[in-house]
């Protein structure tokens, strides 16, 4: 794969393709756009793939600490896909950097508040007064991340940033349905709205750079055309 990508990005991309997480073809998205590729993080359910995604997340987080000043106390995974992610990533961070990250905790939310036992919406470490790093698979419209940020703030936590597996670098659908208009991405809007850093293991640019060593010319061409048509302004 492309030497332009960091080794952990190459390894993650390879695992995603071999595991059927990243597929090429023709896929209708919620936006009704027809995408030449599809990323389904729900397929990271085997031991090998769970290890691959948690390792890639951990290395992305450590890279952001070293190069972008990211600082956090707790890994937060929004229900549902974020739940296994936050626990696996926390374990992996402690394994990779025990001298610096073995005290990192994790938390996740419930879709519905529990009214017995310990009660509440949050499971895991208390968020109050802590710097919280949200982890999830992708950001589509940003609605779920806004809900997570709201929950964290209500619990007294401070949102330090967000890390996702994939940044499609794709503009949001236009309100009037005219996709020829320029526009921002969901990630760009969240950065602007909340003033928080958002990082990704892979971007669409990374996928295109990497796929040149394994994909067909037709898949590469269609993916590049899709990027050109729907690329965000941010």
Curated annotation (Swiss-Prot):
Orotate binds at residues 38-39, 140, 168. It comes from the Eukaryota. The keyword Transferase applies. GO terms for molecular function: orotate phosphoribosyltransferase activity. It holds the Pfam family Pribosyltran. CDD domains: PRTases_typeI (cd06223). One of its GO terms (biological process) is pyrimidine ribonucleoside biosynthetic process. Pathway: Pyrimidine metabolism; UMP biosynthesis via de novo pathway; UMP from orotate: step 1/2. Keywords: Glycosyltransferase, Pyrimidine biosynthesis, Transferase. It is an enzyme of class 2 (transferase). This is Orotate phosphoribosyltransferase. It comes from Metarhizium anisopliae.
């Amino acid at each position: 794969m492309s030497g332009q990508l960091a080794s952990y990005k190459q390894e993650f991309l390879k695992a995603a393709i071999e595991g059927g997480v990243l597929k090429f073809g023709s896929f209708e998205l919620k936006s009704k756009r027809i995408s030449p590729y599809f990323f389904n993080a729900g397929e990271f359910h085997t031991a090998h793939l769970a290890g691959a995604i948690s390792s890639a997340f951990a290395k992305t987080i450590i890279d952001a600490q070293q190069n972008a000043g990211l600082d956090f106390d707790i890994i937060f995974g929004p229900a549902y896909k974020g739940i296994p992610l936050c626990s696996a990533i926390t374990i992996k961070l402690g394994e990779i950097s025990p001298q610096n990250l073995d005290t990192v905790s994790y938390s996740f939310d419930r879709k519905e508040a529990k009214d017995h036992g310990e009660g509440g919406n949050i499971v895991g470490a208390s968020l109050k007064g802590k710097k919280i790093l949200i982890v999830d698979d992708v950001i589509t419209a940003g609605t779920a991340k806004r809900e997570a940020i709201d929950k964290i703030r209500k619990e007294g936590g401070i949102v330090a940033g967000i890390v996702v597996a994939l940044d499609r670098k794709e503009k949001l659908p236009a309100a009037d349905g005219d996709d020829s208009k320029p526009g921002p991405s969901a990630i760009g809007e969240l950065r602007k709205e909340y003033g928080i850093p958002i990082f990704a293991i892979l971007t669409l640019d990374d996928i295109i750079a990497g796929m040149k060593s394994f994909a067909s010319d037709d898949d590469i061409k269609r993916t590049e055309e899709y990027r050109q048509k729907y690329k965000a302004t941010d």
